[in-house]
Structures are given as structure tokens and as C-alpha cells.
A protein has these predicted regions:
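Terminal accessory/anchoring regions of large secretory-pathway or extracellular enzymes
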Residues: 1-231
Length: 231
């Protein structure tokens, strides 16, 4: 969640690059090529610029600028001998404006590289087979439906449903990647980016029997889940 008590506008930048093509937008189901200017857009389904697509799964209100920007390199650096000449370029900017003093604000989007606007429009309804399972302060999780691959970032202990009647719990912060077949887990990878934990303990729905150099499983037939300590 995005929170601030400051009387300053809070923004999340999606991208800011040189403008290299026309900007096409799907807004409330209507597709249009935008003229050069700055604007706020509501009910945006997707945006396309320079072979890159940006999908907004729930539709979103975003700010978009595709116009000339001017500035000096000397204004953004403390280095000496930097030219104070005014530079002018056409720039593409896409961002979320959360406003002043946002409370529990959030955002989500999908970036699709090397795609045409036509291809993006044809596949955006399915979000390119990507499902956002969770997007909270506790954890974030996405699943590629076609490849049956889940990725989860736990910021603290939490639980997420990764398939119908299949949940995964972690007792601490950590990250997990899960390859699935249907509702069954085929491969589970776990990491501790903080490198501070002595162990990570996971509980998954279903009964599994496996053992490795740094993990083992404890099936619980009564609860129909499996306890997986790792170190």
C-alpha cells in the first residue's frame, strides 16, 4: 500500500523514455492514437508505444505525456563542467498519480515487450494469460496460466491461493517459485533475499513426499497439507 501524510503529490512512474512512435491507447474499450500533449486518462485498458505494451488488468486512471520536454543536464547533477545548454526532446511518460496524502493506494500493470498494438489488443482481454493472485502489503503473487508457473514475494508471514483448493503458506519473509500441473505442485523453489534467515518453513495444500539436502516434507493426512522446513 502507498501511504503519505505529506501535502505533496505522490506518483508511481510506469515508464519515461524518448518518444519513438505513436502512442495508442485502449480506453473503455475504444482504441485511439493520441496527439502530442499531457493528459489524465480514465478507464484505460492498455497503452502501446515503441513495441511495448502496458496492460492495466482492472482498467486504471493514469497520466500520459507524449510531447516535447526541455531541460538542462546541469539541473540534475552536481558534476562540474556539465553543459547548461537547454536540451529539447520528445518524451513518453506514463505514470499513476496517487494525489496528496494517499492512504492505502495501490497499482498493478503488466509490461509486454516486442508487441504491436494489434497483437496487444487481441490478447489484452486475457491479460496475456497472467493472473495477479495477490497485491497487498503482506505479499505479491502472479501466475502464468499457460505455463502454470507461480511467483510469490512474501514481505512477512502470509498465505496465498495458487490454484483451486491449493494454498501456500510461508512463516516468514521470502520468495517462492512454483511449477504446477493442474492443482498439484511439481517443483518448488524458495529463496531468502535478505540472507538473514536460518530457515524458511512452508505449508502447502495436499500430500507430498520428498526429501533433499536442505529440506524434507512432513505430510499431515488429517489436515490434507504438507509441512516443508528448509534451511
Amino acid at each position: 500500500d502507498i501511504n503519505s501524510n505529506q501535502k505533496l503529490s505522490v506518483a508511481t512512474t510506469v515508464n519515461q523514455v524518448l518518444l519513438r512512435s505513436e502512442v495508442t491507447v485502449s480506453q473503455n474499450g475504444e482504441i485511439a492514437t493520441l496527439p502530442e500533449r499531457n493528459r489524465e486518462l480514465e478507464k484505460v485498458n492498455w497503452v502501446h508505444q515503441d513495441k511495448i505494451g502496458y496492460i492495466f488488468p482492472d482498467s486504471a486512471t493514469v497520466n500520459l505525456s507524449n510531447q516535447i520536454q526541455k531541460g538542462r543536464w546541469s539541473d540534475i547533477t552536481d558534476e562540474k563542467n556539465i553543459s547548461d545548454e537547454i536540451v529539447s526532446e520528445k518524451v513518453f511518460m506514463l505514470w499513476f498519480n496517487h494525489g496528496e496524502r494517499p492512504q492505502n493506494a495501490s497499482y498493478q500493470y503488466i509490461v509486454v515487450p516486442n508487441v504491436t498494438a494489434v497483437e496487444l489488443n487481441e490478447t489484452s482481454d486475457s491479460n496475456r494469460d497472467i493472473e495477479i493472485l495477490a497485491n497487498t502489503t503482506e505479499l505479491q503473487s502472479v501466475k502464468h496460466l499457460k505455463h502454470e508457473l507461480c511467483q510469490i514475494a512474501f514481505y512477512k508471514a502470509g498465505e496465498v491461493e495458487i490454484a483451486k483448493d491449493t494454498n501456500m503458506r510461508m512463516d516468514s519473509q521470502g520468495m517462492a517459485m512454483i511449477s504446477m500441473r493442474g492443482n498439484k505442485i511439481e517443483k518448488l523453489s524458495v529463496s531468502d533475499p535478505s540472507r538473514k534467515l536460518s530457515r524458511i518453513t512452508i505449508t502447502v495444500s495436499g500430500i507430498y513426499h520428498s526429501e533433499g539436502d536442505d529440506f524434507f516434507t512432513i505430510p499431515n493426512e488429517h489436515q490434507n497439507d504438507t509441512f516443508i522446513p528448509s534451511h
